[in-house]
Amino acid sequence: MLKEYKSVQEVVGPLMIVEGVEGIKYEELVEIQTQTGEKRRGRVLEIDGDRAMIQLFEGSAGINLKDTTVRFLGKPLELGVSEDMIGRIFDGLGNPIDKGPKIIPEKRVDINGSPINPVSRDYPSEFIQTGISTIDGLNTLVRGQKLPIFSGSGLPHNNVAAQIARQAKVLGDDAKFAVVFAAMGITFEEAQFFIDDFTKTGAIDRAVLFINLANDPAIERISTPRMALTCAEYLAFEKGMHVLVILTDLTNYAEALREVSAARKEVPGRRGYPGYLYTDLSQIYERAGKIKGKPGSITQIPILTMPEDDITHPIPDLTGYITEGQIILSRELYKSGIQPPIFVIPSLSRLKDKGIGRGKTREDHADTMNQIYAGYASGREARELAVILGDTALSDADKAFAKFAENFDKEYVNQGYETNRSILETLDLGWKLLKVIPHAELKRIRTEYIDKYLADKD
């Protein structure tokens, strides 16, 4: 039996306090009917004795305390899931916004999900091709991994996100592959960019989009990634699909958490963010993975903008603790016209060695990856030295490494947002660039690989 109350005592921002309640649960869904008959939704955020704090999804403007009815629905916020969601666009609460028909759900699922038993997790080990050389060749994405992209304000992370969503695929089998894309707190122009890109390129045919705009309520922003991950879990673990989940921008999500925390008058943590920011982010990131005995998988690419390009900011800092690496976008490379401006030296995929090699990419992948990293680092050092002391201070080997670093930026990194390179094309390009380095300096590659692959590039 649904419980109704007219004992609203206080409304502060997106929060409502109701007194005299009993028998309700944390995260329970609430329906609020205003004095005009308008219905709004919320969820139970906190219970203290007979007082309940409710988070309003549509805001509190125009609510009259005396004439407002609060109805507790006895269930959490749910998403109706179906394979028909593929190819559709939804708002942050799971409502269709693409003028298509309503989804007839196969079932309704609690958006908070349930944690994967660590014992039942399967270790990520299969390669996912994104078509971007700096990721595929040097910071390989593995099926079931969570690999964030750290960007900055004004950097083209939206272009990178759209490129990955458009190009990503699983090699070696005909398994069903889908992309679940969730955007939080983005502008109308950004939303239109993503929708147009997915539609024009045909990527929408294998994608599910959840769009939360900057002028939508902050509470909806908190629900958006959970809606997306609930959809992904259904497609992966019940329909056997390999799902790539792209979440952007987690900084907007964290700002919404801070806004709600401030309204609740909680004691703030670092930079004013709530003390449970780490726990909250981990509840999102840890929903990636593979389960033993089930064919599907969830791979996550969260994208966040670092305030003032500060990688020690709480959001990227905590994200780095939870996830398995990071892809860094560089403002220096962006100003140089490099597209996409991925800076490979601080970037890292902690699981890359599990998804490369014979039978997955190619036998020479690990050796060339290590040599390219070493060569690029040496080349950047040589270029910096030349700026101070001049080219005459460089040895022949230093000059070769400097030339390699220059070519690497121009040809390997700077592939543009429309170029889709296969992993074999990426590996062959790496060998082509390594030609400028004397063979004696290729100390990280086995001789048999040099004889087999470098000879073909001469």
Curated annotation (Swiss-Prot):
Entries under CDD domains matching the protein: ATP-synt_V_A-type_beta_C, ATP-synt_V_A-type_beta_N, V_A-ATPase_B
CC annotations in GO: proton-transporting ATP synthase complex
Keyword Nucleus appears in the UniProt entry: no
UniProt-listed InterPro entries: ATP-synt_VA_C, ATPase_F1/V1/A1_a/bsu_N, ATPase_F1/V1/A1_a/bsu_N_sf, ATPase_F1/V1/A1_a/bsu_nucl-bd, P-loop_NTPase, V-ATPase_su_B/beta
Keywords on record: ATP synthesis, Hydrogen ion transport, Ion transport, Transport
GO molecular function, one term: proton-transporting ATP synthase activity, rotational mechanism
GO biological process: proton motive force-driven plasma membrane ATP synthesis
Domain of life assignment: Bacteria
Transmembrane stretches, start-end: none
Function: Produces ATP from ADP in the presence of a proton gradient across the membrane. The V-type beta chain is a regulatory subunit.
Protein's recorded name: V-type ATP synthase beta chain
Lineage of origin: Bacteria, Fusobacteriati, Fusobacteriota, Fusobacteriia, Fusobacteriales
